[in-house]
């Protein structure tokens, strides 16, 4: 312990507090409270809550929702396990039959995300993601500002197609290597505090860029795929991959640029203009990768093919007779099968580009959570609970939509600092779908900012895995992360509200003052 510096001690204490208790006990205090509170709310709702104009089935679904939401928030049992409850409770309450419930777990949306995961695993297996990232950084130059921006662009781009966590885990070791090189090669006129500020800026910028980049595509982050699924389930309308990119990519670009300016020139302002050895290290790592291998080329071609099909489906494939019923999930499965089909040249390592061994690396729990959320939303709709909630929410009719959007964005963004972003989106979006009918606005005016905000957690290590990875480097304290993250939260709120008001309506072709009827 005597050899630990203050940062190491803080990190050790933090990790002990949040992990050791879980290792030594089956349940921590919060989980025990949730474990009891969930079923208790279920029973009390059934016994004591009998409002007018709400059927017994509606009351039953409300009770289920409170139980599931409590377990999701407290993580009393694994979130994915909680997401299996609709399969049990909805048929028991005669709300939906087993076939109707289980069909939600096989929704096209889930297969879109599954295909995205498989493509990401293929990129990681053959190291294409590292080559792309290093190329981007190498292109942008040697100044500290450009290196910082290069890392953010590379991480943000990767995060559009692989998980936020994977993107950050790829980039952090490269960033730490550059920091180490800078410390070893620092010039006599380079102040130690300048290097310290730069290393804090770099690791935090990588973490934030991983979170921001997820907003770029529908497969970039779970809240967006939940948005697509819940919107389609509630209203029978679709958000296409291509149209979301027209919204998401500019959002990512603007946020990355604003956060880069804030981190480089305000939060971690320093006098070091160039980084000793930084460019040389990047070139060395590129050299170590060697020439692009056959397998990398195959994955790149399949990736470009998938992107082309997703982007053109709306205005090209839909107009061809034999592809008119093709959905984004269909394309995802097509590219997945291609990756399983194409042989690899390096057969000592793997016989094909990917094989079924990758199945163990797929986040099945996330896919089950999606299914549980869709099943619960179906139950809310079919039981009449959605219409009843809409009637109750008419109390806020007449409030400015801008105020509602702002409040939703702030509430969800700060809520997701302490709860799972996926669980938050799964809980909040069906409620907002109903709220849109009550306040006479288009549902996407409320659902889009909530989904985007659910992805944005910058203040705490527990807020999102990228933050935890950054904190784990020992380069940044919780206090500093919270103070910097607070201002990044505010930047995100402003950008999200502006995007929702000025970009979403024309791109998606909606009139924000026209509500949609629930299915």
From Swiss-Prot:
Matching InterPro entries: SLC13A/DASS
Membrane topology: Multi-pass membrane protein
Protein's UniProt keywords contain Transmembrane: yes
GO terms assigned for molecular function: organic anion transmembrane transporter activity; symporter activity
Subcellular location: Cell membrane
GO CC term, one of those recorded: plasma membrane
Transmembrane segments: 29-49, 59-79, 103-123, 136-156, 159-179, 201-221, 241-261, 297-317, 322-342, 362-382, 395-415, 428-448, 451-471, 490-510
Chief location: membrane
Keyword Lipid metabolism: no
CDD domains recorded: SLC13_permease
Record keywords, A-Z: Cell membrane, Ion transport, Membrane, Sodium, Sodium transport, Symport, Transmembrane, Transmembrane helix, Transport
Any one biological process term the GO annotation gives: sodium ion transport
NCBIfam families in the cross-refs: dass
Chain's role: Mediates the transport of dicarboxylates across the cytoplasmic membrane via a Na(+)-electrochemical gradient.
PANTHER family cross-referenced by the UniProt entry: SOLUTE CARRIER FAMILY 13 MEMBER, SOLUTE CARRIER FAMILY 13 MEMBER 2
Similarity field: Belongs to the SLC13A/DASS transporter (TC 2.A.47) family. NADC subfamily.
Protein's recorded name: Sodium-dependent dicarboxylate transporter SdcS
Organismal lineage: Bacteria, Bacillati, Bacillota, Bacilli, Bacillales
Record gene name: sdcS
